[in-house]
């Protein structure tokens, strides 16, 4: 009996020991996994969910376009955040249209991300934590590694130059949102816009492709790995034989022989890929490849030794085309033919020509129509009146054979006025028949043998 009780107590002690050991291991494992689980998921009470469902619809739309949701989710998982949300009117009507178009271009995704991160502070700053008038301005670092200054003066809470109009508008456990009256623009984004508007950043620098977005994950694709040193060249030696942009404008060389030293199809494919990576010219590339066979025709011309300059309208200009303008048979081909110049021109060469001669007419592949160009507002303007277009994106692609210049409108040839010549009735002038009466009289007198009576009949 005693042995049974002793053995039973030993089993109970052993069971309690293993229970305590398993419980301590489970608690330690839960402690180790708690930070990762908090940073990996966002609950429905998050400040990000509140932003997407709030009155600040314009800001929420920009955050989605800038692909910042994953970045903000990671930031909320690590710490609280404070968002300064501009009102919708500040982004719809008060913002410069050119600046807004600059932000929405695919090639300026980094500038848009920097602008939005400038409105977010990686800690919690409520209205009760605002600096007083005596303390002056207090600097806070943003998620974009910039600094914003919080101040309080004349009863108004300010963040930089924007007034807080809705303090503590949305409050959540992981952050809060303040409503502000205007958009905050960091200095770096303003400088990028000024360089772009003055064409300084693209006048003498090779264009870089716009960031590529993976449609499956809605995230940026990783750039390709750099080519190792000593690897064979990516382009054939014939590409080095082509004249550079410094020689433009130059007449087209004569057709090549049967060897076809220039791979025109590869060059056309290269410039179409450049259009797609540059961003904003997808419609033009779609017409060249899918709607028409112009890409193949251009490749044959380049292979034979000819050079081409393409005036490529951007997507906004192509969207203004009506269905009637594209539904007629051969209409897309005729539109593109009018935008191809059979000579090599760069932005510099065309601008120098219009500055020197005032107005220059370039031949097009839509014979016999020509496209007129002149200098306007420090750039090159094509066409006249409402059907005009400005050279908007210079030197998108220049390889010595094909030059692509971006314009902000679709060009159409001027309609020829047919002047119908009206035939006026011609009045017939009856000439007098002189001497007929005298001739008849002489013949009658001659019949009677008395024509000698008149001296006129002799």
UniProtKB/Swiss-Prot annotation:
Residues 1-30 form the signal peptide. Keywords: Glycoprotein, Proteoglycan, Repeat, Secreted, Signal. PROSITE patterns: FAS1 (PS50213). Residues 43-184, 268-411 form the FAS1 domain. SUPFAM superfamilies: FAS1 domain. SMART domains: FAS1 (SM00554). Residues 225-235 have a biased composition (Pro residues). GO terms for cellular component: extracellular region; plant-type vacuole. Residues 207-262 are annotated as: Disordered. Glycans are attached at residues 80, 290. It is found in: Secreted. It comes from the Eukaryota. May be a cell surface adhesion protein. Belongs to the fasciclin-like AGP family. This is Fasciclin-like arabinogalactan protein 17. It comes from Arabidopsis thaliana (Mouse-ear cress). The gene is FLA17.
């Amino acid at each position: 009996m005693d042995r049974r009780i002793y053995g039973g107590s030993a089993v109970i002690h052993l069971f309690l020991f293993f229970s305590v050991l398993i419980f301590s291991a489970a608690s330690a494992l839960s402690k180790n996994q708690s930070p990762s689980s908090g940073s990996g998921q966002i609950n429905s009470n998050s400040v990000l969910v509140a932003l997407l469902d709030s009155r600040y619809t314009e800001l929420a739309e920009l955050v989605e376009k800038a692909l910042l949701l994953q970045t903000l989710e990671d930031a909320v998982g690590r710490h609280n955040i404070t968002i300064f949300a501009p009102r919708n009117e500040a982004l719809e009507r008060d913002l410069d249209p050119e600046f807004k178009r600059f932000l929405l271009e695919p090639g300026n995704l980094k500038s848009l991300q920097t602008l939005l991160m400038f409105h977010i502070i990686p800690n919690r700053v409520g209205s009760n934590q605002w600096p007083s008038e005596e303390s002056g301005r207090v600097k806070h670092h943003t998620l974009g590694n910039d600094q914003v200054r919080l101040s309080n003066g004349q009863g108004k809470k300010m963040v930089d130059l924007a007034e807080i109009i809705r303090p503590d508008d949305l409050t959540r456990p992981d952050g809060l949102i303040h409503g502000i009256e205007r958009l905050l623009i960091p200095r770096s984004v303003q400088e990028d816009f000024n360089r772009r508007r003055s064409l300084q950043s693209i006048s003498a620098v090779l264009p870089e492709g716009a960031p590529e977005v993976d449609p499956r994950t809605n995230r940026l694709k990783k750039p390709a790995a750099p080519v190792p040193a000593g690897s064979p060249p990516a382009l054939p030696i014939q590409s080095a034989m082509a004249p550079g942009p410094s020689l433009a404008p130059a007449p087209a060389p004569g057709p090549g022989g049967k060897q076809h030293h220039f791979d025109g199809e590869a060059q056309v494919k290269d410039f179409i890929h450049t259009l797609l990576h540059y961003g904003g010219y997808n419609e033009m590339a779609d017409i060249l490849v899918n709607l028409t066979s112009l890409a193949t025709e251009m490749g044959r011309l380049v292979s034979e030794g000819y050079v081409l300059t393409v005036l490529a309208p951007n997507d906004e200009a192509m969207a203004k085309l009506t269905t009637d303008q594209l539904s007629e048979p051969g209409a897309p081909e005729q539109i593109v033919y009018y935008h191809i110049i059979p000579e090599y021109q760069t932005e510099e060469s065309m601008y120098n020509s219009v500055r020197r001669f005032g107005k220059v007419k370039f031949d097009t592949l839509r014979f016999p129509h020509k496209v007129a160009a002149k200098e306007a507002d420090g750039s090159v303007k094509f066409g006249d009146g409402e059907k005009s277009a400005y050279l908007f994106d210079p030197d998108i692609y220049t390889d010595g054979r094909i030059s692509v210049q971006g314009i902000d409108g679709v060009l159409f040839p001027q309609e020829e006025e047919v002047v119908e010549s009206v035939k006026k009735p011609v009045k017939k002038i009856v000439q007098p028949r002189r001497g007929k009466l005298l001739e008849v009289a002489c013949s009658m007198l001659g019949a009677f043998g008395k024509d000698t009576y008149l001296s006129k009949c002799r």
